[in-house]
Amino acid sequence: MESYKKEFIEFMVDSNVLKFGEFTLKSGRKSPFFMNAGAYVTGAQLRQLGQYYAKAIYEHYGDDFDVLFGPAYKGIPLSVATTIAFSELYGKEIRYCSNRKEVKDHGDTGILLGSKINDGDKVVIIEDVTTSGKSIEETFPIIKAQADVEIVGLMVSLNRMERGLSSNASALDEIQEKYGFPANAIVTMEDVVECLYQKEYKGQILIDDERKKAIDAYYAEYGVK
């Protein structure tokens, strides 16, 4: 495993973002693990997170894009932190944009926060995690309703490696098939298991045999065939 992947997995654990237990996801699935980007709360955490995302986006999509779109609510700090990191690491000024859950009718009106989206813009979407592709069903129409844009791709931090909403393909593969743009992640759940299974980290084993059995059972039901 590449060293940066191991570092990022440990960063998620240290930030209390990656947890193990029993969780009900937005998709309705019961999962033995959960990733919550809302737990990144300090300046140091957000700075480091933005750098991980910026490096992954640069690796997969380069810097030929104009806007980084982070869907409300968790995508808002992700887009801000990553545009800052992009400027620091690569000297490229990317605009951030997010949506509001409710349209604002006074002052800075409309559905968007940050930059407006203009005809001809190239957009990268940034999210914490995509389980079933449901979130993109909500985000894609919002972006396309703003202007005639090209969506370059989607970047998430964790690929959960499970089926999407309507096929046996992974959620990320299903997004690419349905919407026509690539979807990538900093790390996969397979990377997480490889990194943590039966390996002590800071005095504890986060994935022991029992937890590995629960993860395997989850993928037997929801994993990519």
Predicted regions and their residues:
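Active-site-facing substrate-recognition patch
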Residues: M1-Y61
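A contiguous pocket-lining binding segment that forms or flanks enzyme active sites
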Residues: L112-M161
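Short, glycine/charge-rich flexible loops or terminal/linker lids adjacent to PRPP-binding catalytic cores
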Residues: V80-V123, E137
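PRPP-dependent phosphoribosyltransferase catalytic core
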Residues: E2-E10, P141, A145-K225
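Structural detector of well-ordered beta-strand residues that form the stable sheet scaffold
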Residues: L68-F69, C97, V152, N184
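Phosphate/pyrophosphate-binding loops at sites that engage ATP/ADP/AMP, CoA/4′-phosphopantetheine
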Residues: A54-F65, F140, K144-D148
